[in-house]
Amino acid sequence: MTEQKYVVALDQGTTSSRAVVLDHDANIVSVSQREFTQIYPQAGWVEHDPMEIYATQSSTLVEALGKAGIRSDEVAAIGITNQRETTVVWNKETGKPVYNAIVWQCRRTAAICEELKARGLESYIRDNTGLVLDPYFSGTKIKWILDNVEGAREQAEAGQLLFGTVDTWLVWKMTQGRVHVTDYTNASRTMLFNINTLQWDEKILAEFNIPLSMMPEVKKSSEVYGQTNIGGKGGTRIPIAGIAGDQQAALYGQMCVQAGQAKNTYGTGCFLLMNTGQEKVTSNNGLLTTLACGPRGEPAYALEGAVFMGGASIQWLRDELKLISDARDSEYFATKVDTSNGVYVVPAFTGLGAPYWDAYARGTIVGLTRGVNSNHIIRATLESIAYQTRDVLDAMQADSGIKLSALRVDGGAVANNFLMQFQADVLDTEVHRPKVTEVTALGAAYLAGLAVGFWDGLEELQGKAEIDRSFKPHHDEEKRQRRYKGWKRAVKCAQAWAVLHNEEE
């Protein structure tokens, strides 16, 4: 029998699908990545084509194995990690989606959320799902599809439609429609899953008018869900053995498996998660209570704060303002000036996430004078990522009663040394950047590998988490608080803008 030397992580993100092949020492052997189309039918609406998601993801799997000359019988397992909340509804007979995937960033269901609040559902949803009533989560997206796509409601009532977050859709496609599952971490992001009972909440489903028959079976983040024969020569069936939403996968990849350990992922958005173990901590500060992975992939509780615009605000500097030609140049230009010259950028392009939860906030630049140049704006945009992270971390420490000794970081933007140092300064906390920054893929691979015995256990995995660099805080306290106070004033200027703007029209 061929020795199984590899685990593959499929990392299905907001802008690209990736496949990452890891060996037994958790070294990256091969990577393949494909971008796919972002669809913006109206202002504030964001969609993806589910067929394109599957096509790009399956082709990266084939390509990553092919590039490294790896046969499928050398792969012990596949782990999946995915953009969360993004909603796919498809017909189980035809296998075709009834509508495009509605992406987590999409704000089209703001009015549905207002209507549900008016019906008094907010506190029930908060207490039982751990989430706030916001367009971000899957529940109102499913309701929108059933209410607005011709024939969808009738097909759903007849038991012909299935719902899935992206993980569910990929597993269903990869198993030729045999397996309809999700894991606890993804289920906890739908606003339809009761995190106290660990079951779909039938009261919420009834209130949203969503049939239970559409919902996938919910399983641990580390177990064999099914087999796939996609990906490489040999045609061997590979177990799909790990699933976790991208942020929970990163938390696991950083080995934050004990209560009180936390990480921040700097991707399209920023996501700060703190593992709270078996204790469900309810936030009084606008954070979410969600499910994460315990040591063996079983459900554990976590606090989460989501910032909608992290790396996406750097893309805005590049693509819309044309101030930089490459995202990596932002560090060079930001360090050409000593300060932001009193400028604050609040990148609330799609509203504000935690701890504000203001769907009507909009992007704002304040403090402009004639002396401000493009470098100041670039610097202020980078600084906004660090300020938003502090907003969330302050709330998290207040809720949990735990003062973090260090923050573990990952995601594309952690390569930016200016941002990491500024982050340490703003937080007055050490920031630890790991050697392997692909921790989301690492988490999915670890979960899959553990399920099939590729790795023995947690101790073996914890030995692989090496730190590349620690950033220590430099700012004095007075300067830190003065700058942060300025940020808070800038946020006030951005809030509720769309409401006032609409009234004026």
UniProtKB/Swiss-Prot annotation:
Belongs to the FGGY kinase family. The gene is glpK. One of its GO terms (cellular component) is cytosol. Pfam families: FGGY_C, FGGY_N. InterPro entries: ATPase_NBD, Carb_kinase_FGGY, Carb_kinase_FGGY_CS, FGGY_C, FGGY_N, Glycerol_kin. Glycerol binds at residues 84-85, 136, 246-247. Keywords: ATP-binding, Glycerol metabolism, Kinase, Nucleotide-binding, Transferase. Key enzyme in the regulation of glycerol uptake and metabolism. Catalyzes the phosphorylation of glycerol to yield sn-glycerol 3-phosphate. Sn-glycerol 3-phosphate binds at residues 14, 84-85, 136, 246. Its EC number is 2.7.1.30. One of its GO terms (biological process) is glycerol metabolic process. Pathway: Polyol metabolism; glycerol degradation via glycerol kinase pathway; sn-glycerol 3-phosphate from glycerol: step 1/1. Inhibited by fructose 1,6-bisphosphate (FBP). It is an enzyme of class 2 (transferase). Disulfide bonds: none annotated. ATP binds at residues 14-16, 268, 311, 315, 412. GO terms for molecular function: ATP binding; glycerol kinase activity. This is Glycerol kinase. ADP binds at residues 14, 18, 268, 311, 412, 416. It catalyses: glycerol + ATP = sn-glycerol 3-phosphate + ADP + H(+).
